[in-house]
């Protein structure tokens, strides 16, 4: 099967669970694949315990659909009698062992297992073609597995398969731009790109969309097959019936035989015939959404993630202080919980609570060093020495440090300033406040964050900008708790006043940004990278209070200092630990204070600013 990665236009006939747990129905599907002229049939081999936890809402369904090892042997032998190659979806150790026993020709890892690093590595070492589903994946997840495999030279037979299924799957749930973009990003690693089409089988587009994907560079097309759509066997929604599948195979083979990277419209006309060509032209002329730029995760991708993604669970009882290994972790669907945490980020971490067999593994059950990193320097284009300006007798940076030190969930507070002598005073203040100090790059703020985190061995970073001195430490503690439970790449506080937002993220996230930013200088605008869910999984925490949207609690101008002076004069002398919520209530009754600086402009990114990542 090595030629599969060198020949564009291969079709994989996906039987999925269309057999409904009946070996005889599966044989009929195999007959249909053979009749169509496709060369590869794919089976979904699994036992229920590989897919879901006991008691999961789909537990009984998977039991009804699962075939035995002997039945898979029978089905595979039958397919080979029909001169078909056999691929198998792998969902865990059991299905991998069965597939190896069957000596299948290739594997696929479903997108639900994309975070199961060890399983993918183990399957890849069999040195067979390996399709990896990446539908509904954040790019950081794809980048994580490809770079992991690349380090051990296992990318050469990898084919990434974009495509999602949401029952029914609308046309605009697919992105052909995704195919081109994945080729650009991951072909340098040696990986190829395919396309898993899930358009409703009763739509003419079900024939045409894969043809366009081929012209975009897809090597393989995966397409669901059924006998007769009217019978409505399981998984029929995205499937073509027997006769239509044969027609589809004929289209693809004729286009592929032209040996043209980009077929012309006259090529399509000669292959499709007059009537189908008219439908094809209409599709192309009305498919602009399929070629839209990739900027954020679509609602369909988010829906797909909720339906399919597995979470890490304990393979056995884990005591306190246990250092995790791959043997301690399995991935299963868990009702109501979606932990987007790859297994290679769990390895080596120690448990801080007991974790029972089958219990979800999340950061809050593991040792994590969490540091609040305050970024500050004295030189500023808009307000020089703003960190040293005094409000009620104390430097603004001192007020900020005092508030952050009240956070109960932080293991340490670090002032990350520059190596420029002008910032010596900031280092002295940090030492007086008994917090840690890191001095680094003058202009590369993201690098300063990263190097400070590495110096003090942080697992998780709380991003704190030095000109936002009225942080809500209570909300910040709540956000840290949420971050450790949800295990997203990034947790942000939102619906807070200007100057009160925080981001919490793992140290490896900022490393990805630094190494892969298209324009390195733009990493200064770190929040725009962090909160792009095309790249990273995001979790949000909101306060339970309201506020006047004109309130501005950041420092960029002298008017900001003047406004904050009024706030501190009202609260600080009677209660130095005053809460942000009390400030917001007071400002509601004193709008004249808000007016002091409400007309000052907040520094938003220019719409032309390039904050893309090469992942």
Please state what every model-predicted region is:
Residues 39, 105, 219, 410-411, ...:
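Short acidic/polar active-site loop segments enriched in Thr and Asp
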């Amino acid at each position: 099967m090595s030629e599969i990665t060198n020949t564009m236009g291969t079709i994989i006939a996906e039987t999925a669970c269309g057999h409904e747990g009946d070996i005889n129905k599966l044989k009929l599907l195999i007959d249909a694949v053979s009749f169509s002229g496709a060369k590869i049939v794919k089976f979904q081999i699994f036992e229920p315990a590989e897919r879901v936890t006991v008691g999961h809402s789909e537990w009984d369904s998977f039991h009804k659909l699962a075939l035995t090892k002997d039945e898979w042997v029978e089905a595979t032998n039958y397919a080979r009698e029909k001169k078909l190659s056999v691929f198998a979806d792998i969902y865990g150790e059991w299905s991998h062992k069965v597939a190896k026993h069957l000596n299948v020709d290739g594997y696929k890892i479903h997108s639900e297992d994309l975070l199961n690093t060890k399983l993918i590595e183990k399957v890849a070492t069999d040195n067979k073609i390996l399709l990896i589903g990446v539908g509904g994946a954040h790019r950081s997840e794809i980048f994580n597995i490809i770079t992991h495999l690349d380090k051990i030279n296992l990318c050469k037979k990898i084919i990434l398969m974009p495509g999602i299924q949401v029952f029914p799957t609308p046309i605009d749930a697919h992105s052909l731009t995704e195919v081109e973009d994945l080729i650009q990003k991951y072909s340098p690693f040696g990986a190829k790109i395919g396309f898993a089409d899930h358009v409703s089988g009763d739509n003419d587009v079900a024939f045409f969309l894969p043809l366009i994907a081929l012209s975009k560079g897809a090597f393989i097309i995966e397409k669901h097959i059924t006998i007769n759509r009217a019978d409505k066997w399981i998984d029929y929604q995205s499937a073509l019936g027997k006769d239509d599948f044969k027609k589809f195979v004929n289209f693809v083979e004729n286009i592929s035989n032209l040996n043209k990277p980009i077929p012309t419209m006259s090529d399509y006309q000669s292959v499709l015939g007059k009537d189908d060509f008219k439908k094809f032209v209409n599709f192309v002329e009305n498919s602009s959404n399929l070629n839209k730029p990739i900027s954020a995760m679509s609602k369909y991708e988010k829906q797909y993630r909720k339906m399919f993604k597995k979470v890490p669970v304990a393979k056995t009882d884990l005591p306190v202080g246990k250092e995790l290994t791959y043997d301690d972790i399995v991935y299963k669907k868990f009702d109501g919980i979606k932990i987007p945490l790859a297994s290679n980020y769990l390895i080596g971490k120690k448990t801080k609570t007991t974790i029972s067999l089958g219990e979800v593994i999340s950061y809050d059950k593991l040792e994590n060093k969490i540091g609040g990193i305050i970024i500050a320097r004295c030189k500023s284009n808009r307000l020089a020495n703003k960190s040293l300006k005094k409000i009620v007798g104390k430097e603004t940076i001192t007020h900020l440090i005092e508030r952050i030190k009240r956070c109960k969930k932080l293991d340490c507070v670090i002032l990350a300033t520059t190596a420029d002598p002008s910032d010596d005073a900031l280092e002295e203040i940090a030492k007086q406040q008994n917090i840690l100090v890191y001095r680094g790059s003058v202009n590369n703020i993201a690098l300063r964050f990263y190097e400070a985190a590495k110096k003090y061995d942080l697992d998780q970073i709380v991003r704190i900008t030095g000109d936002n001195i009225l942080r809500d430490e209570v909300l910040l503690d709540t956000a840290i708790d949420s971050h450790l439970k949800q295990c997203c790449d990034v947790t942000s506080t939102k619906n807070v006043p200007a100057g009160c937002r925080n981001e919490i993220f793992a140290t490896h996230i900022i490393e990805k940004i630094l190494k892969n930013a298209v324009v390195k200088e733009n990493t200064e605008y770190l929040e725009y990278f962090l909160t792009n869910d095309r790249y990273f999984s995001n979790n949000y925490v909101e306060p339970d209070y309201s506020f006047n949207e004109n309130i501005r609690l950041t420092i960029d101008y002298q008017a900001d200092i003047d406004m904050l002076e009024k706030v501190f004069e009202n609260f600080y002398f009677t209660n130095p630990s005053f809460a942000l919520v009390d400030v917001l209530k007071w400002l509601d009754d004193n709008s004249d204070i808000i007016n002091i600086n409400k007309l000052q402009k907040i520094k938003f990114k220019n719409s032309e600013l390039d904050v893309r990542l090469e992942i």
